[in-house]
Curated annotation (Swiss-Prot):
Essential for the assembly of the photosystem I (PSI) complex. May act as a chaperone-like factor to guide the assembly of the PSI subunits. TPR repeats lie at residues 35-68, 72-105, 120-153. One of its GO terms (biological process) is photosynthesis. This is Photosystem I assembly protein Ycf3. Pfam families: TPR_8. It comes from Prochlorococcus marinus subsp. pastoris (strain CCMP1986 / NIES-2087 / MED4). The keyword Repeat applies. Its main location: membrane. GO terms for cellular component: plasma membrane-derived thylakoid membrane. Belongs to the Ycf3 family.
Length: 173
């Protein structure tokens, strides 16, 4: 295990050095460079489990970043942190903001669906079948969109949609 960790640390460090070199020579505005640096530092903090620090960096990046795709990616990473921290409602809101910035992020839809499906399973365990069906239907709705954006990328979700009877034939076209 230590060898894998050393290799991963080496790869992370090498990537950081290469990325910094590219950012320095790229003909982009200082504001965009700073946004990227905050994003990169947020990613590093997130990978190290320093979620509070990562959120600080991501928020700084969002203040500077104008590119919608990059903003969407930053928001998606923030939503992942909220999800990891058990802040499901905040995570959903942040995923939705990410999708407003960049609607072509199937992983955001997938993760929203995971939260809905989890809530459905919880309702089922508590014997509330109406709530279960509501949450499962919501999961199916967002997962269907994810599968359309990334066909074949979420086979487990496609299987769930089929076996739960919540798929529509056009998902697979």
């Amino acid at each position: 295990m230590p060898n894998n960790q050393n290799r991963d640390n080496f790869i992370d460090k090498a990537f950081t050095v290469i990325a910094e070199s590219i950012v320095k020579i790229m003909p982009i505005a200082d504001k965009e460079k700073k946004a990227y640096i905050y994003y990169r530092d947020g990613l590093a903090a997130q990978n190290n489990g320093d979620y509070s620090e990562a959120l600080d960096y991501y928020n700084e990046s969002l203040l500077l970043e104008e590119n919608k795709i990059d903003r969407g990616e930053t928001l998606k990473n923030m939503a992942i942190i909220y999800m990891s921290n058990g802040e499901e409602d905040r995570s959903i809101e942040t995923y939705q903001k990410a999708l407003e910035e960049n609607p072509k992020q199937p992983s955001c839809l997938k993760n929203i669906g995971l939260i809905y499906e989890k809530r459905g399973r919880f309702a089922e365990q508590n014997g509330d079948l109406d709530q279960r069906d509501m949450w499962f239907d919501k999961a199916a709705q967002v997962w269907s969109k994810a599968v359309r954006l990334y066909p074949g990328g979420y086979l487990d979700i496609e299987n769930w949609l089929k076996t739960s009877g919540r798929s529509s034939i056009d998902i697979y076209l």
